[in-house]
Curated annotation (Swiss-Prot):
CXXCXGXG motif repeat ranges per the UniProt record: 146-153, 163-170, 185-192, 199-206
GO molecular function list: ATP binding; heat shock protein binding; unfolded protein binding; zinc ion binding
The species this protein was found in: Shewanella baltica (strain OS195)
Principal cellular location given in the protein's record: cytoplasm
Ranges where the J domain occurs: 5-70
Domain of life per record: Bacteria
Protein name: Chaperone protein DnaJ
């Protein structure tokens, strides 16, 4: 009996993508799979036909031969190593195609030992430490490779054997009606190996709890939220697998004087009324020590002064930020009688000349006066 066209079997056109061919196959395979149609010979024949068409049209070489020569190009009886046909195994083909949907499908080879877990260490620094950089000694609790069994988990002189239930895969396939579900092997608990004589130190795990001390170089310029990766310093992998990594998470404590914003530092510097009015020099703090700052006469409170290059050196670009100092005029307190008298005398000298000496205040009170006039008009 002549075979149907493979494209017709799957209900697709000749220019259909492989992805669409797979989608068509999945839809038809679900419909005609023998598990869904027990005892139905027609459904079984249809499934074989669908499976054959799928295997040809998803193999680039076989598809090219079929497109050029038709069924003769993939007929094994005509020589040339064409399509091998055969009944095949319903469970195998179904598991391969639907494995991504139902959680696994077939696995080739034995289960690989798991890589060690990554670790996180929260490191708090002062602003000075973060800006200048330093080397820190960190004590890290972790899982290390057992030195008695060298990570095998087995008693010295013995070795683990491949699990006979899952054949080293660590999982077994449980068929539940139409579906095939992968589950951890109940015999080896997902390891793929059986340890008959476990190590007396690690009790078969291959790893032991241990604390280690690491000398970690913290680069200058780090800030809160930065993370330093130390490759291979995480937990040991199981049974000789590679270790995980250690991530040092940086946070910087608040400073009593400075506030950091990126590479710039900010601070407030109090000045006296007389210094603001007459000008002069004041000392301001930096992370490198005190420096002199010249205050011009008639400086108003809140004025910002920039000290270039006195900020933070970027850990990435190596550009250096600035220190921005905001002067805040401090009202004198705890005045004695003489000081109060001098201030009254000074206040008296300003009478009638407020516009000249306090232009902002004069403008403010003029605005208030106009506001009430408009309100009452």
């Amino acid at each position: 009996m002549s075979k149907r066209d493979y494209y017709e079997v799957l209900g697709v056109s000749r220019d259909t993508s492989e992805r669409e061919i797979k989608k068509a196959y999945k839809r038809l395979a679900m419909k005609f799979h023998p598990d869904r149609n027990p005892g139905d010979k027609t459904a079984e024949a249809n499934f074989k036909e669908i499976k054959e068409a799928y295997e040809i049209l998803t193999d680039a070489d076989k598809k090219a031969a079929y497109d050029q020569f038709g069924h003769a190009g993939v007929d094994p009886n005509r020589g040339g190593g064409g399509y091998g046909g055969g009944q095949g195994d319903f469970g195998d083909i179904f598991g391969d195609v639907f494995g991504d949907i139902f959680g696994g499908g077939r696995r080739g080879g034995q289960r690989q030992a798991a890589r060690g877990s990554d670790l996180r260490y929260n490191l708090e620094l002062s602003l000075e430490e973060a800006v200048k950089g330093l080397t820190k000694e960190l004590r890290i609790p972790t899982l290390a490779t057992c030195d008695l069994c060298e990570g095998s988990g087995a008693k010295k002189g013995t070795s683990a054997t491949t699990c006979g239930t899952c054949h080293g895969q660590g999982q077994v396939q449980m068929r539940q009606g139409f579906f095939a579900v992968q589950q951890p092997c109940p015999t080896c608990h997902g390891r793929g190996k059986i340890i008959k004589d476990p190590c007396s130190k690690c009790h078969g795990d291959g790893r032991v709890e241990k604390s280690k001390t690491l000398s970690v170089k913290i680069p200058a310029g780090v800030d809160t939220g930065d993370r330093i990766r130390l490759a291979g310093e995480g937990e040991a992998g199981e049974f000789g697998a590679p270790p995980g990594d250690l991530y040092v998470q940086v946070s910087v404590r608040e400073h009593a004087i400075f506030v950091r914003d990126g590479n710039n530092l900010y601070c407030e510097v109090p000045i006296s009324f007389s210094k603001a009015a007459l000008g002069g020099e004041i000392e301001v703090p930096t992370l490198d020590g005190k420096v002199s700052l010249k205050i011009p006469a008639e400086t108003q409170t809140g004025r910002m002064f920039r000290l270039r290059g006195k900020g933070v050196k970027s850990v990435r670009s190596h550009a250096v930020g600035d220190l921005l100092c905001k002067v805040v005029m401090e009202t004198p307190v705890n005045l004695n009688d003489r000081q109060k008298e001098l201030l009254r005398e000074f206040e008296a000298t300003l009478t009638g000349e407020s516009k000249k000496h306090s232009p902002k205040a004069e403008g403010f009170f003029d605005g208030v006066k106009k506001f009430f006039q408009d309100l009452n008009s």
